[in-house]
Amino acid sequence: MYFVYMIKNDFEKLYVGITENPKARLYYHNSKMGAEFTKGKAKFRIVFLEEQGSLAEARKREIQIKKWRRDKKEKLVGLYNKGISTKIDKSS
């Protein structure tokens, strides 16, 4: 099982990625062992998490979300945090 996730820090920086273990991945981001983008940029928290059935599906969704403008990403985060299914809009 794979997850597409978004993390955000206190400076409102958003990062999109995929992982099999969201808790461990967040630890790596916050301990400066994660992606270059997140190193030394304050503590991140998970603001979006979406389960995918396979690595291929997760990668496809990650790429899709990364192409979106910030406002669309924030809308997705808002839906997730309201408990609304985020799998309703998979169009680019």
Q: What name fits each language-model region?
A:
Residues 1-35, 39-71, 76-92:
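GIY-YIG nuclease catalytic motif and its immediate N-terminal context
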